[in-house]
Amino acid sequence: MLKPKRTIAELKELRELTADENGAWRVAWTDTWLKAREWFNRKLEGLPVEQHYDAAGNNWVTLRGQSEKALLMGGHLDSVPGGGWLDGCLNLLAGLEVLRRIAEEYKGNPPVTVRLVDWADEEGARFGRSLLGSSAFSGTLRPELEKDRTDKDGIRLEEALRRCGVELSRMLEAQVEQKNAAAYLELHIEQGPVLLDLGLPLGVVLGTFGVERHAITFRGQAAHSGSTPMHKRKDAFLAAAKMASEIYHITDRNGGVSTIGSCVTRPGIVTSVVAECTITLDQRHLDAQALARLKFEAEEASQRFAREGGLPEPEWQTIWRIEPILFHPKLIEFCDEAIREVAGVSHRLPSGPLHDAAEVARAGIPTVMMFVQSLHGISHNKIEDTKEEHLELAVQALDKLVSKTMDWILGR
């Protein structure tokens, strides 16, 4: 029998174990994260399941079924430093509750195989590489590009992984876990204000935004701030400052979201006109063509502002780029139905943040996500929260989605 209140109790238990007054500290590849994983494994005792870690450190729990075709559910125990009590772990513990219900109902032998995975290092909080375990599973990870990563203390990623039993050079062997995967489902807090503003507890995720992330450098000329007339200046910061306003106009026209997240000036002293200014630009959209327009118009604007200031053409350096991922239309329908059955009303929305589900979909596995409302519209923060009645609805809706998907898998 499904017990959604048990999921909430276990989330609170995990919070007590791995958080303090400043939030959760389950950063991947740390002792606190390992302690959380040991705690989770103890929750499996008495269930007719098999548990193992793959080559990327992803933790797999498998309930064998009459068919080798497998329904996958996933989440992640790792958090950002000072993070919330729900991000990632809700997915996993709700999945565990559904797994318990299936094991009980089918006496340990469901019609299809059901697998639950705790993805390793979704957040990328320590080494700056998000979706590490799931990208190894999907095959998009390039280990040779990650080997030089270090944390703030100078510890190498390769060293931290090895301490946890993972060899960076062998992580792509995790692709073997794709075998027989027929569908992937992921419940997640929304981490934004859309469902809150609509007054709805649950929503269906259409897909994850594509991302264009660039560093833009404007180059001017350093000059004395007291003796250089305003009309004589070649101020790199002025061109960059104009971009801050312009990206709002560009995004209003095309949709999506755009953010200038950092700004560094050189020489960076109060008595000098700025000679060089580098800003970072993050642009996201669910539609690939619209995302391309966002970038194109931002490039045009940067060139125009440079010319207006008498500067050379700005330099654009790509930091990261990822295509939008659209989730499976049939699973979106099932998710809609499941939500309406437990909450009465559903809503479809894209995901701005990236999730492990995007990597699973990238591997060609039919995928969908379900969002539950976030109070305050805030995540990655100790105030992250969701009403308990909404958490219960989320577990119930996930359970219904799982049942619908199992039937669909059998009929394919």
Label each PLM-derived region with a short phrase:
Residues 7, 12-17, 74-75, 275, ...:
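Zn-dependent metallopeptidase/amidohydrolase metal-coordination segment
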Residues 19-64:
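A non-catalytic alpha/beta surface segment that caps or lines the substrate-entry region
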Residues 25-29, 261-269, 280-286, 313-332, ...:
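A short beta-alpha structural unit
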Residues 73, 82-123, 212-218, 224-251, ...:
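Alpha-helical metal-binding/catalytic segments enriched in His/Glu/Asp
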Residues 121-122, 126-289:
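Midchain, well-structured core segments that form catalytic/ion-binding scaffolds
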Residues 206, 224, 228-253, 300, ...:
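His/Asp/Glu-rich mid-to-C-terminal helical/loop segments that flank catalytic regions of hydrolases
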